[in-house]
Amino acid sequence: VDAVEDSDEARTRAQKAEAALYRVYGDNNLEQLDLETEIDCAILGDACYKVIWDTTEKKVRVTAPDVQGIYAWWLGDDTSQMWRVASKYSLSAEETELLYQAKPKGKTATIVELWTARDFELYLDNALVEKKPNPYGFIPFIIYSNLREPKKFWGISDLPQIMESQRELNRAMSQLSRILELSGNPIAVLENVEESENIAIRPGAVWNIPEDARAYLLDLLQGGGISLHINYIDLLYRTLHDISESPRSAFGGIERDISGVALEIELNPLLQKVRRKRIIRSVVYKRRNEMILKLLEKYRGEDFGDNHLRIVWGPVLPQDVARQVNNEQTLVQTGIHSRRTAMDEIGIRDPECEFKRWLEERETILRMNKELNAKSTKSGARERASLSQAEGVEE
């Protein structure tokens, strides 16, 4: 959280807003919620957050409703402007009576919440139960896509593009498994034998066959045929990794030592995919933080001022911390970066608090140095006085 105005009061309010966000994140376990929501988003193609005020516990509540029950209306061709959102979900009769003081006719009830920026409507089994002005002044839902299709509101899942390759890989693996199973239970072949009975294939078995007959076991692996199946499976693996933009090296499949730049080039498809997703998520998390601060200002009377919210992402690849620190040190010394910006880039969670600690340590060290210098000055003066007195006595 960065203050828009350049004043001590504005910076204090920005620090207060950042601390409030950290508390809400901790109260709602948002790190775990974000992980679960991201998995749902990758599978379903879309995800949703709901930010409301919990009147019972008097705090901000952040949840992730099932996006399959979310319906949205947007303005014309501008898919970023939602003017109405409906949330549909089912509750048991006991839950319905506990939450809404209404007893449904059946064992379950269908609840529909209809939100606009001005109004809120609640339906229970298609019957209007409550209608009132929106207490928040905004729609408390944030709907976002996994990967957005051009000019469409709803996104696409990561699964359809890899499903065909995965099915073919499963078929090839099953075929190879059957071949290996048959080779482990070989088939006995008897030539020039008109009839046979009680022929068992086991260690030490003795077969009595005519003089001109021949017996042998059918080897399904001879001639290198099994290698064709293995090569085809490797080809499917490569296709699967290429389509999903996740190179094999992302799973620790590097069998040679390479430099950091070479690793970054090899993982570039995955980095581009992560970057596309982060662009979408940055807007979502920023909007969620804005909703949290608005609810705290409305219901707790807080005043956070006018601030600029930023999302700081961690590095995807392992970083050379020593090199990064040296680069930031040079940027700070040349006046290009401030100390707080350098801390942000390195990954310090709370740069403002860390900067305060640095100032306190610096002030303590300077005070100790002054005290030591003062003591050494007094000691030197005493030694000089003692020497002067000794010289006077000798004379």
Identify the residue ranges that each predicted region occupies.
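C-terminal helix-loop subdomains that flank or include functional centers
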Residues: 194-195, 201-216, 220, 227-228, ...
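A broad, structural surface signal
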Residues: 19-30, 43, 54, 167, ...
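Short, Φ-rich (hydrophobic/aromatic) sequence segments
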Residues: 1-2, 33-42, 159-176, 281
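Short low-polarity hydrophobic stretches
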Residues: 49, 166-169, 342
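Extended, charged amphipathic alpha-helical segments
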Residues: 122-265
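Structured, mid-chain assembly/scaffold modules that mediate subunit interfaces
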Residues: 1-139, 292, 296-303
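Short coil/turn segments at secondary-structure boundaries
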Residues: 2-4, 34-40, 51-54, 180-192, ...
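Conserved aromatic-histidine-acidic binding/catalytic patches
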Residues: 1-5, 9, 37, 157, ...
